[in-house]
Design a protein with these regions (language model features):
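Short glycine-rich anion-binding loops that position phosphate/pyrophosphate groups of nucleotides
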Residues: 59-62
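Conserved active-site segments centered on acidic
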Residues: 1-45
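Phosphate-binding/catalytic loops
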Residues: 65-127
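Conserved acidic residues
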Residues: 52
Length: 127
């Protein structure tokens, strides 16, 4: 969402709904993004939505992702699961921060390569 601005509708969903992980909330707050009020969504509730892209970020999600609309490009990027990291709270937060940074790098590149080319150069004039 951050890198695409208003140029794209962005959804986040998983194979099941669950409470937002507090390490994820803390990690995102450290990056000045408040996700504390967001709710998780089940991908099954979005199967009637037409998507240009569906991006899966773990191998389990890739295997469970339902078929989407025709023309939808599926992209898979496997990020490590920070929930799998044991140790102290500091170790766990560090794992979330590393994955957050990896996802940020991917999101920036994805928007630059796939979304920005679709935006007319004179977008300000069209608004």
């Amino acid at each position: 969402r951050y890198y695409s601005g208003n140029a794209a509708e962005v959804y986040s969903a998983g194979d099941e709904s669950y409470d937002i992980n507090m390490f994820a909330v803390k990690s995102m707050m450290d990056a000045v993004l408040d996700i504390s009020h967001q709710k998780t969504k089940n991908i099954a509730k979005l199967t009637d939505t037409d998507f240009d892209f569906v991006i899966t970020v773990c191998d389990e999600a890739r295997a469970m992702c339902p078929e989407m609309n025709e023309g939808c490009r599926k992209i898979h990027v496997s990020f490590p699961d920070p929930n799998a990291v044991g140790g102290s709270e500091e170790d766990k937060l560090m794992a979330f921060n590393m994955v957050r940074d990896d996802i940020e790098d991917f999101a920036f590149d994805f928007v630059h390569n796939n979304i920005r080319p679709l935006i007319p150069e004179n977008i300000e004039e069209l608004i």
